[in-house]
């Protein structure tokens, strides 16, 4: 007898967009049921069922096996769970007596004990079609009413019945549906006398179809919150690029996942007086700025409880006040610090990089792919024009991230205003290679193993550009050598460095230490 699990995760959810891969405590939502099912040791394999290769690739990162993409007719919101499961039973050629477990991609509250209890119950009751989970309604449906045409009781006969006298009713918890393959093949109804329902506490159950319920489920998976004022200040000038904002948004997200309140402030002025007025003695400050001077950092540290600075290059001793925490997640950052001081606490290297899991996926090798991603940040229009001019006759399609679209651009160019992370990840995945500045996008190109040419556009980018090149991850180029370098760019995976380079594994510990939690 075989036992398999299938995680259903279609990409067209309507109430919460992309709910199955929404970030949930530093993992895509669908990672939770996959990991729990694998850790239970009950199943031969855990499969991902989806209509999206993006979802499939994310799921594979967490150990799921790949089924063929679902047919469109089974990927819309009219397709039922039983229809999808019946399709997969035939696809996997399961025997009637085999066991299949259906899980939903958004089942973040699933636990191993739920699966083991269901598996044991099904095996003990051979005539049972399914075992699923349920939970009592928090308020009795017998006392429910509608508001159409005034207040209308749904069960008028119980309008005066004491609540303690009302029969307990249950709802489907949606965590799992475990059954015989034959029952799924024949699409036997789940809610019938041939099924067994396992009762769960309401604290173990949450439907996240609505955003409010998503927030509730976050509270359930993390039972307490420690709240404190955390303020993040980052450069947001026309000439500062987009990297400061992007990495601070990710830091903010990590902090919130620790149950801590945080706010992001965009630094667009020549002084910090307005921001400084809002800083209190209990505040934890994080800054990511090239525009602040040494005096500014002393003023901030004097008013705040603690200060962390994000930087890309070492500053002289005394530039920051004593007890400042210094975060630099440049590749091999420690190698470039020559005057380490006991006055500061350092967090150096890619282990502290804030990883976005949406950029981690297996990249297929496709030498026929003619799509090229170009991303230089938000301010390098002159260089961008030169790159387009060099490549416009190379028989490729250029996908350019830029806040500006020129008049009458070449036919092989496609311009995109700054994209959100999910959109950027999808575009990156669709391209065979990239030409990028040496800013924060380097790390996402590395995570996605996108063959790339690197063109530093600022002095602070040179160090990390050289480090990535020294490891054979990317090649540094220039406008003079771009045409030749592009011709020689190999569309292949480079697994050697990928196996030894770990991004982001130390960040949570550093933030916990900084925030004293």
Swiss-Prot record:
Family, per entry: In the N-terminal section; belongs to the CMP-NeuNAc synthase family. In the C-terminal section; belongs to the PseG family.
Subunit structure: Monomer.
Function: Catalyzes the fourth and sixth steps in the biosynthesis of pseudaminic acid, a sialic-acid-like sugar that is used to modify flagellin. The N-terminal part mediates the last step of the pathway by mediating activation of pseudaminic acid with CMP by forming CMP-pseudaminic acid.
Co-factor note (free text): Mg(2+) is required for pseudaminic acid cytidylyltransferase activity.
Note: In publications, PseF (HP_0326A) and PseG (HP_0326B) are separated into 2 separate ORFs. However, these 2 enzymes are fused into a single protein in strain ATCC 700392 / 26695.
InterPro entries, per the entry: CMP-NeuNAc_synthase, Cytidylyl_trans, Nucleotide-diphossugar_trans, PseF
Gene Ontology terms, MF aspect: hydrolase activity; metal ion binding; N-acylneuraminate cytidylyltransferase activity
Catalyzed chemical reaction(s): UDP-2,4-diacetamido-2,4,6-trideoxy-beta-L-altrose + H2O = 2,4-diacetamido-2,4,6-trideoxy-beta-L-altrose + UDP + H(+); pseudaminate + CTP = CMP-pseudaminate + diphosphate
List of catalytic residues: 244 (proton acceptor)
This protein's UniProt keywords: Hydrolase, Magnesium, Metal-binding, Multifunctional enzyme, Nucleotidyltransferase, Transferase
Species for this entry: Helicobacter pylori (strain ATCC 700392 / 26695)
Annotated stretches, region: UDP-2,4-diacetamido-2,4,6-trideoxy-beta-L-altropyranose hydrolase: 209-517
Origin: domain of life: Bacteria
Spans annotated as Pseudaminic acid cytidylyltransferase: 1-208
EC nos: 2.7.7.81, 3.6.1.57
Cofactor entry: Mg(2+)
Protein name: Pseudaminic acid cytidylyltransferase and UDP-2,4-diacetamido-2,4,6-trideoxy-beta-L-altropyranose hydrolase
């Amino acid at each position: 007898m075989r036992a398999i699990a299938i995680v259903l995760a279609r990409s067209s959810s309507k109430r919460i967009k992309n709910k199955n891969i929404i970030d949930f405590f530093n993992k895509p939502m669908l990672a939770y049921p996959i990991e729990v099912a694998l850790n239970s040791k009950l199943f031969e394999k855990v499969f991902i069922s989806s209509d999206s290769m993006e979802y499939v690739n994310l799921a594979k990162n967490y150990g799921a096996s790949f089924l063929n993409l679902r047919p469109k007719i089974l990927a819309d919101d009219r397709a039922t769970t039983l229809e999808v499961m019946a399709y997969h039973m035939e696809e996997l050629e399961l025997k009637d007596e085999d066991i299949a477990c259906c899980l939903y991609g958004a089942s973040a509250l699933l636990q191993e004990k739920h699966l083991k209890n269901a598996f044991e119950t099904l095996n003990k009751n051979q005539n049972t079609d399914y075992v699923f989970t349920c939970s009592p309604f928090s308020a009795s449906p017998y006392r429910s009413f509608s508001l159409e045409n005034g207040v209308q009781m749904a069960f008028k006969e119980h309008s005066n019945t004491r609540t303690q006298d009302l029969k307990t009713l249950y709802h489907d918890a949606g965590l799992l549906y475990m059954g015989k393959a034959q029952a799924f093949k024949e699409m036997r109804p789940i809610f019938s006398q041939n099924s067994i329902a396992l009762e769960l506490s309401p604290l173990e159950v949450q439907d996240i179809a609505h955003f409010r319920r998503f927030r509730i489920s976050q509270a359930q998976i993390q039972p307490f919150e420690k709240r404190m004022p955390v303020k993040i200040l980052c450069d947001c000038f026309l000439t500062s690029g987009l990297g400061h904002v992007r990495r601070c948004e990710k830091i903010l997200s990590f902090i919130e996942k620790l149950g801590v309140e945080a706010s992001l402030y965009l630094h667009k002025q020549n002084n910090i007086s307005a921001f400084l007025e809002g800083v209190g003695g209990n505040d934890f400050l994080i800054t990511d700025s090239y525009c602040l001077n040494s005096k500014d950092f002393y003023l901030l540290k004097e008013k705040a409880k603690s200060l962390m600075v994000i930087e890309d290059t070492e500053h002289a001793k005394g530039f920051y006040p004593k007890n400042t925490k210094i975060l630099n997640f440049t590749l091999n950052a420690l190698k470039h610090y020559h005057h380490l001081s006991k006055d500061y606490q350092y967090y150096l290297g890619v282990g502290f990089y804030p990883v976005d899991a949406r950029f981690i996926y297996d990249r297929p090798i496709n030498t026929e792919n003619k799509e090229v991603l170009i991303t230089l940040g938000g301010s390098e229009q002159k260089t961008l024009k030169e790159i387009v001019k060099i490549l416009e006759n190379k028989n490729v399609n250029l996908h350019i991230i830029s806040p500006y679209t020129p008049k009458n651009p070449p036919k092989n160019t496609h311009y995109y205003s700054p994209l959100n992370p999910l959109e950027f990840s999808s575009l990156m995945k669709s391209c065979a290679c990239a030409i990028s500045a040496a800013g924060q996008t380097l790390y996402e190109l590395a995570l996605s193993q996108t063959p790339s040419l690197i063109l530093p556009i600022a002095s602070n980018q040179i160090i990390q550009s050289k480090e990535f090149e020294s490891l054979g991850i990317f090649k540094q180029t220039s406008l003079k050598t771009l045409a030749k370098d592009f011709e020689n760019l190999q569309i292949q995976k480079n697994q050697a460095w990928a196996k030894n380079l770990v991004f982001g594994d130390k960040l949570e510990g550093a933030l916990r230490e900084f925030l004293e939690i």
